[in-house]
């Protein structure tokens, strides 16, 4: 949904994934070896990754340093992706110009957290996606129909991958 909306607005969209797959309208970078190349051409990094041992802390000094100077980040994935002190340092140095943060390691974000006062940071109340009850009901009904038909369920968590 994010890709479709950005492409419709005329943006060039690049994506990075652990494994190869195609997404219409998006140039894909695949695997750990392509991560630095992906970062180098990313002006606004939108993180929607699942939380795994490999992605915990991914929004930190190394990632920020790989982005073009003056880039921005949006985190609507998981709060544990972000290393807050690294973000504050990247903002102070000008490496990043801003951040929109919708998720936090501790929610609600404590009133005295420096992210509230950091220049260039927009804090939102974990609302990047608000699924309507009708959408949720349809997803459940879809899986019930699949179960009754003896088909594999959709959106099953792979415990080996962690998502």
Please name every model-derived segment.
Residues 1-2, 12:
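Internal, well-ordered alpha-helical segments in soluble enzyme and binding-protein domains
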Residues 2, 6, 67:
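Aromatic pocket-lining residues of Rossmann-like dinucleotide-binding sites
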Residues 5, 9, 41, 143, ...:
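Short alpha-helical functional segments enriched in proximate histidine and acidic residues
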Residues 7-25:
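NAD(P)-binding Rossmann-fold cofactor-contacting core
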Residues 12, 27, 97-98, 120-122:
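Conserved beta-strand segments of alpha/beta enzyme cores
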Residues 19-114:
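Rossmann-like adenosine-cofactor binding region
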Residues 22, 107-163:
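C-terminal helix-to-coil terminal segments
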């Amino acid at each position: 949904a994010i890709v479709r909306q950005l492409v419709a607005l005329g943006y060039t969209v690049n994506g990075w994934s652990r494994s190869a797959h195609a997404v219409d309208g998006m140039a894909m970078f695949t695997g750990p070896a392509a991560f630095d190349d992906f970062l180098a051409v990313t002006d606004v990094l939108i993180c929607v990754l699942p939380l795994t041992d490999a992605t915990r802390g991914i929004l930190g000094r190394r990632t920020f340093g790989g982005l073009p100077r003056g880039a921005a980040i949006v985190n609507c994935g998981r709060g544990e992706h972000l290393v807050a002190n690294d973000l504050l340092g990247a903002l102070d140095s000008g490496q990043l110009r801003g951040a929109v943060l919708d998720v936090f390691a501790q929610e609600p974000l404590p009133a005295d957290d420096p992210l509230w006062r950091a220049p260039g940071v927009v804090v939102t109340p974990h609302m990047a996606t608000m699924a309507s009850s009708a959408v949720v009901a349809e997803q459940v009904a879809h899986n019930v129909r699949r179960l009754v038909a003896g088909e594999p369920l959709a959106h099953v968590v792979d415990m080996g991958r962690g998502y």
